[in-house]
Amino acid sequence: MFWETALGENTGRSEVEKLNDLDADLQIYDPYIYAVNYQGKVAQIDPTQGRPIWSADVSSVAGLAVDDAHVIVTDEFDTVHAFRRSDGEPAWTQEGLSHRRLTAPVIVDGLIVVGDFQGYLHLMSAEDGSMVGRLRSGVGPIAGTPVTRDGMLYVQSRSGKVAAVRL
């Protein structure tokens, strides 16, 4: 093994309290690796040594997205957090989507987009997290992370339907 690093410690009295799972996909945004886990942290990791450059306390089962300025995380309570990519300091927080069972975020043309359990896509400003709009995908509860390509946003429902949306 070349290296390994832990994003959080398994603390607590019961087995449930000790859960510290990686449920989200890693992201690579040159030259760093970004990771977030449940009951742990979000971190920027040096890929040559496995050493965290910075980390911040946040718990996520959904995931994260990265752009030049920010690391965006959907937490376990459906709050969307932006951390400055340069130093991990909080940039903004969007708390207006609680109880929506949000997907991991995706960044598209200066917007942060998350899907929810009712099939809505919520659009936020990447600059300050303010709500910009909301679209109904038409496919039902959104599963997984929306993906983008050539100006289109693609989402998949829990029932297997796929929709394409131009933002």
Please name every model-derived segment.
Residues 2-28, 53-67, 92-109, 131-149:
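Extracytoplasmic beta-rich repeat domains
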Residues 46-49, 84-87, 125-129, 167:
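Short loop/turn segments that connect beta-strands within beta-propeller blades
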Residues 102-126:
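C-terminal hydrophobic structural anchor segments
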Residues 40, 78-79, 118-120, 160:
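Short coil/turn segments within WD40 beta-propeller repeats
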